[in-house]
Swiss-Prot record:
Function noted in UniProt: Catalyzes the formation of isethionate from 2-sulfoacetaldehyde in the deaminative pathway of taurine. Constitutively expressed enzyme that only mediates a small part of the activity observed in taurine-grown cells.
Domain of life: Bacteria
Binding site for NADP(+): 6-30
Family in the record: Belongs to the short-chain dehydrogenases/reductases (SDR) family.
Keyword match NADP: yes
Phylogenetic lineage: Bacteria, Pseudomonadati, Pseudomonadota, Gammaproteobacteria, Oceanospirillales
Gene3D superfamilies to which the protein is assigned, alphabetical: NAD(P)-binding Rossmann-like Domain (3.40.50.720)
Name of protein: Sulfoacetaldehyde reductase 2
Catalytic activity: 2-hydroxyethane-1-sulfonate + NADP(+) = sulfoacetaldehyde + NADPH + H(+)
């Protein structure tokens, strides 16, 4: 019987790339996302090689999350790895210019959504025991502040601390917990953040070499497939051409 991974936000970016990476290794896949057409397309692609179960899901909906887990087919119930990938960034403008609804959406998705899924899947991960993993998608924004990050950065700081504290609670169960924290990566993420402004999204990556979704997927897979006695607590990764900025100074 092949190992089983559950990936949220599997319809694009890191989630889709992770689904392909785990499929390459023969894992069975539980894929969730809000866009049914994309889920269907990905399932059709990957089901040629591995077993795939899909569920249209908004992770913000606590009851829907629990229903998806409760209704998993018997062959998909013994989840070994959970990849909490679903998340988004909105409103790159300064905090004082942001629509409050955008802040609420980020909190509901990046924090509450991750908590909803984790809580629902924990019992089966604990039952699986040694070698089971939770991989949370964080961000360098959770560690390093920058203008326009406001609630997005704060939500990813939550992911980091939730990862660490969950790890403490799960000590002795065999379940590992990791925060994978990427820097600049070229995915649909930026297009969503800019409200669909393709020119602004393209400008961010112009004349540099960002991470690709496949780079991050490789790290997700790596942390989940290390020997059972090894836990990567946090894995921060940036493109070689990205580094930290100097402190901002306001001058007269």
């Amino acid at each position: 019987m092949s190992d089983i991974v559950l990936i949220t936000g599997a319809t694009s970016g890191f989630g889709r790339a992770a689904a392909r990476r785990f499929a390459d290794a023969g894992w069975s896949l539980i894929l969730t996302g809000r866009r049914e057409e994309r889920l269907t397309e990905l399932a059709e692609e990957l089901s040629q090689r591995v077993r795939v179960h899909t569920a249209v899901l908004d992770v913000r909906d606590e009851k829907a999350v629990q229903s998806v887990i409760d209704e998993l087919p018997e062959a998909f119930r013994r989840v070994k790895t959970l990849v909490n990938n679903a998340g988004l960034a909105l409103a790159p403008q300064p905090a004082q210019d942001v629509d409050l609804a955008d802040w609420h959406t980020m909190i509901d998705t990046n924090i509450k959504g991750l908590v909803n899924v984790t809580h629902a899947v924990l019992p089966t991960l604990i039952e699986t025991g040694a070698g089971a993993s939770i991989v949370n998608l964080g961000s360098v924004a959770g560690q390093w502040p920058y203008p326009g990050s406001h609630v997005y950065g704060a939500s990813k700081a939550f992911v980091q601390q939730f990862t660490y504290n969950l790890r403490c609670d799960l000590q002795g169960t065999g379940v590992r917990v990791t925060d994978v924290a990427p820097g600049m990566a070229e995915t649909e993420f930026t297009l969503v953040r800019t409200g669909g402004d393709q020119a602004a999204s393209d400008a961010l990556y112009r004349d540099t070499t960002p991470l690709q979704a496949e780079d991050v997927a490789e790290l997700i897979f790596y942390t989940a497939t290390l020997p059972a006695h090894v836990n990567v607590n946090r894995l921060e990764v940036m493109p070689t051409r990205q580094a930290w900025s100097a402190f901002a100074v306001d001058r007269d």
